[in-house]
C-alpha cells in the first residue's frame, strides 16, 4: 500500500501523511470504506451522536489479519481515514493509532480506541468474520424492549429473510460455516443480551451468545443496539440492512397485534 494524502477534518489537503497502512487511491481500502459506510449509517440514524462503530478486517489485502477500527467518541459522519486504529490478529497487536499522526491533526483531540473493540475481536476470533458493525438502531432497541421478557427475537415467513446466511457447524472443523441462504419458511432467531454500563463489559455475554447460537450472524443488546458481522464488509452491510428491515417490520407487526412467527414454526 502506498503513502497517501489525507484530509484534515478542518482544512482539506493541508497535510501529506506518509502511512503504509493507508491508501487514499483505493476506494475499497478498509480505512476508506469505514468512512464511507459511517456516513451512510449516519444518514440511516444508526450511528448518531458518536454512537455505534464499525471495524473491517483486510481479508483481500496482503495481510488478512489486519483489522481497521473506527475510534471512540468521534462524529461518524465526519470520520477521516487517518483516524483509524489498526490491530493485527491473533494477538491483537496495536500497529497504528491516529495519535501518532502529526500534531496539526491531533492537537485538539486525544483519540481513544473504540469501546467496541473487544466485542469486534470476539466476532473475528470466534466466527472468522471479515467485518463487524455495531449500530444504535432504534428498530433494534424497540425490538429488545417489545421482547422484554425474552432472551430471543424470532420472526419467520418474511421474504427479506432470504438476504441472511444459513449457518451450520462443520462437524470436522468445529467452525461455523455458511451453507447457503435462509429461505422464506425459515425462522430467524437472534439472541438478546442485557446491556451493561460500559461497552466492554458486554464481551462475555456476547461471546456466550455467539457460542450458543451458531446459526446467528447478529446479537441484540437490550436498550442499546445490535452487533452484526459477516464474511466480508459487503456481506456484513447486507446482513445489517436486512436485519434492520426485519426489526422495523417486527415492531410494526407487534404494535398491530400480528404475530411475527406462525404456529407451524
From Swiss-Prot:
Keywords: Amino-acid biosynthesis, Cytoplasm, Lyase, Metal-binding, Methionine biosynthesis, Zinc. Substrate binds at residue 116. Pfam families: Aldolase_II. GO terms for molecular function: methylthioribulose 1-phosphate dehydratase activity; zinc ion binding. One of its GO terms (biological process) is L-methionine salvage from methylthioadenosine. SUPFAM superfamilies: AraD/HMP-PK domain-like. Belongs to the aldolase class II family. MtnB subfamily. Catalyzes the dehydration of methylthioribulose-1-phosphate (MTRu-1-P) into 2,3-diketo-5-methylthiopentyl-1-phosphate (DK-MTP-1-P). This is Methylthioribulose-1-phosphate dehydratase.
Amino acid at each position: 500500500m502506498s503513502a497517501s494524502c489525507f484530509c484534515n477534518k478542518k482544512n482539506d489537503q493541508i497535510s501529506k501523511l506518509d502511512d503504509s497502512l493507508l491508501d487514499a487511491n483505493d476506494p475499497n481500502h478498509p480505512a476508506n470504506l469505514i468512512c464511507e459506510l459511517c456516513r451512510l449509517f449516519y444518514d440511516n440514524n444508526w450511528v448518531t451522536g458518536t454512537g455505534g462503530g464499525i471495524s473491517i478486517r483486510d481479508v483481500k489485502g496482503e495481510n488478512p489479519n489486519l483489522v481497521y477500527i473506527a475510534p471512540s467518541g468521534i462524529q461518524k459522519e465526519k470520520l477521516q481515514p487517518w483516524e483509524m486504529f489498526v490491530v493485527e490478529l491473533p494477538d491483537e497487536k496495536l500497529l497504528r493509532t491516529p495519535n501518532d499522526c502529526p500534531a496539526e491533526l491531533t492537537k485538539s483531540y486525544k483519540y481513544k480506541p473504540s469501546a467496541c473493540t473487544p466485542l469486534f475481536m470476539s466476532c473475528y476470533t470466534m466466527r472468522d468474520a471479515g467485518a463487524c458493525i455495531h449500530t444504535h438502531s432504534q428498530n433494534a432497541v424497540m425490538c429488545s424492549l417489545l421482547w422484554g421478557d425474552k432472551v430471543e427475537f424470532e420472526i419467520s415467513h418474511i421474504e427479506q429473510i432470504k438476504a441472511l446466511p444459513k449457518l451450520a457447524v462443520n462437524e470436522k472443523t468445529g467452525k461455523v460455516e455458511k451453507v447457503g441462504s435462509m429461505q422464506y419458511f425459515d425462522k430467524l432467531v437472534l439472541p438478546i443480551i442485557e446491556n451493561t454500563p460500559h461497552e466492554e463489559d458486554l464481551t462475555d455475554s456476547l461471546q456466550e451468545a455467539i457460542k450458543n447460537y451458531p446459526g446467528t450472524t447478529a446479537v441484540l443488546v437490550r436498550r442499546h443496539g445490535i452487533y452484526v458481522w459477516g464474511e466480508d464488509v459487503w456481506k456484513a452491510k447486507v446482513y445489517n440492512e436486512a436485519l434492520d428491515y426485519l426489526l422495523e417490520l417486527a415492531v410494526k407487526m407487534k404494535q398491530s397485534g400480528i404475530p411475527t412467527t406462525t404456529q407451524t414454526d
